[in-house]
Amino acid sequence: MLLNIKKYNKYNNKIETMTLSAGNVTRMVASYSYNDISRLLSIKRSGNVLRGYDFAYDGLNRLEESTYAEGAGMSQNKNRYSENILSYSQNGSIERLQRYGKKNNGAFGLIDDLTYSYNGNQIKAISDKAGSLLYDGSFDFKDGANADVEYFYDANGALVKDLNKGISNIEYDILGNLKCITFSNGFKTKYIYDAAGYKLRTTHESAVTNTTDYIGNFIFEDGKLDKYLFGGGYCSFDNNQNPTFHYYEKDHLGSVRMVVNENGTIEPSHTFGVVGYVKEFDSYFNEVVSCPVFGKNNTDLEEKITIVEQ
């Protein structure tokens, strides 16, 4: 059984604690603290390890620092996953961003040192002085280009080319739905929708062509039933079409933090960075595991080809 208990401040209705339990065992307790004008100052999460962030803001109430730490006194492994916004543009857009995490040698340190340039409010280019991580499963920014203009848009403001991700062209249908992504290596991802704009099929054309079909709440991979989606999670099917149920436990933002299968086994837990990216996937057995279907705020995490907003 899954249980999510939230406690709110009776004066300002801000969340104070959230307790996630599965199989009658408490798996996570998150506590939130605020300053006198209700700005979030810290989030601390218990589980295998107590971990959390402390936040600092500038005079315009914009986030400047998010300092990560672990342990009862929040003094261990300090800055392992910290994020710092060093400057904003006059329009309020991020100009300099630093992220910390696991480096290629296994140590923790600076993994992203990003500088953003804009044309109005549209990102024109991003450079990374920290370089790219090489290990599988890394979530740093991949600086795949070194040009004055790396992002291109159409007249409607939709992205049509991304040099950093090797995307040479993005096509949209007349309703503005994503139709085809073409990569510089010739690979393509194509999408088909019904008249109402609901996605019916995704086709990944690479060395091998794979299809994903969506029929109501059913998902088929290469013609075989793979998942059935329902409000609190999904049901997966193995090669013999035997079902296994998986249940979501979400945080106060609606992001999936815990997945529990029908046997009460904890599946991957998700840890999101402060500036909108996944910083790690972990399980309660400290194993590296494959990510599930849905990510932050229930958006798709496409495992074959992914476009991530920075």
Where are each of the predicted segments found?
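Short glycine/acidic-enriched loop and turn motifs that connect beta-strands
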Residues: G23, G47-V49, G101-K103
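Extracellular/periplasmic ectodomains of large secreted or surface enzymes and adhesion receptors
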Residues: S21, Y32, L110-Y153
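Active-site-adjacent structural elements in folded domains
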Residues: V25-R27, D143-N146, N240-P243
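Structured, non-catalytic alpha/beta "coupling" segments that mediate domain-domain communication
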Residues: M1-L3, K7-N9, L86-K124, Y214-G223
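Intrinsically disordered, low-complexity Ser/Thr- and acidic-rich flexible linkers and loops
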Residues: A72-Q76, N104-G106, L133-K142, C291-V293
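Short, isolated positions in well-ordered beta-strands
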Residues: T189, L225-K227
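Residue-level markers of secondary-structure register and packing in elongated scaffolds
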Residues: M1, K7, E16-T17, S31-S33, ...
